[in-house]
């Protein structure tokens, strides 16, 4: 890891295979906490590259505990967090609204790392018992139209860095990775991101997948659709800027 850190400190970039190997080594406990914290810090100082993000994502997907809920054709609604706005858990609340409307939702989340409360904190406080048991997840989907996947149960690398992320208290590239590695690989996904470069990075990454996606970012900094500023939406076919007034009016056929 020392040689890799020196390279990164000199503003060099990792290849996709190198990035994948690093995440695998983190999951296997080959690096100490200080080394992992240093790696996280690198990506606070510069943007992550497409190849680095792809390599990190591939490693997490390869190591995940797979969950097959494809028969439900579910949607995941998720935000990166890290926008510094201290809002309540909007994407988590949205999942229940969508499930209440009869659509199947598979929510993948974790404890808060850069905020007081992450999706798992909310679920836990409401009495949800985290599980990786596929039968229980299916029953939850059948009875409530929603299943919750607590990320550390399905990915060893995310579990390995949880305490480090919490102690640092700053957003990291793991914020970027969480929404990209739902072990169900949902049919549909709505993702909120904290800046425009990440919106385009996500959009580029998802072009390689079969997921029907929409990535949103509000120009006032929220990783959500905002009521106080224009927001950008990137989908497979297009990228478009919308105004909040659209939410109160009937959209045109083109929208």
Regions flagged by a language model, labelled:
Residues 1-87, 101:
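Acidic, glycine/proline-rich low-complexity segments that act as flexible tails and inter-domain linkers
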Residues 39, 123, 178:
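Residue-level signal for inorganic ion chemistry
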Residues 74-116, 175-181:
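Glycine/serine-rich anion-binding loops at beta->alpha junctions
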Residues 112-128:
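Active-site-proximal loop->helix
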Residues 125-140:
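A glycine-rich helix N-cap at a beta->alpha junction
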Residues 136-192:
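Phosphate/diphosphate-binding glycine-rich loops and adjacent basic-rich segments that engage nucleotide
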Residues 187-230:
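Glycine-rich ThDP/TPP pyrophosphate-binding loop and its adjacent helix/strand module
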Residues 248-255:
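Conserved small/polar residues in nucleotide/adenosyl-binding loops
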């Amino acid at each position: 890891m020392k040689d890799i850190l020196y390279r990164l400190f000199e503003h060099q970039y990792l290849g996709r295979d190198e990035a994948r190997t690093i995440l695998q080594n983190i999951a296997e406990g080959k690096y100490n906490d200080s080394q992992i914290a240093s790696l996280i810090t690198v990506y606070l100082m510069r943007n992550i590259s497409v190849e680095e993000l792809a390599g990190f994502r591939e490693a997490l997907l390869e190591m995940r505990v797979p969950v097959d809920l494809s028969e439900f054709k579910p949607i995941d609604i998720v935000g990166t967090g890290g926008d510094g706005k201290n809002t309540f858990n909007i994407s988590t609340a949205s999942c229940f609204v969508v499930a209440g409307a009869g659509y199947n939702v598979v929510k993948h989340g974790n404890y808060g790392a850069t905020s007081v409360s992450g999706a798992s904190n909310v679920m836990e406080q409401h009495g949800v018992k985290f599980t990786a048991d596929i039968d229980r997840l299916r029953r939850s989907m059948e009875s409530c139209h929603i299943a919750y996947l607590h990320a550390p149960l399905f990915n060893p690398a995310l579990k390995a860095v949880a305490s480090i992320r919490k102690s640092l208290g700053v957003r990291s590239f793991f914020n970027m990775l969480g929404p990209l590695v739902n072990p169900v690989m949902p049919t549909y996904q709505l993702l909120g991101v904290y800046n425009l470069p990440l919106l385009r990075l996500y959009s580029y990454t998802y072009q390689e997948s079969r997921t029907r996606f929409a990535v949103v970012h509000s120009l006032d900094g929220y990783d959500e659709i905002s009521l106080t500023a224009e927001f950008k939406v990137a989908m497979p076919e297009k990228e478009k800027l919308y105004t909040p007034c659209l939410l109160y009016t009937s959209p045109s056929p083109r929208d």
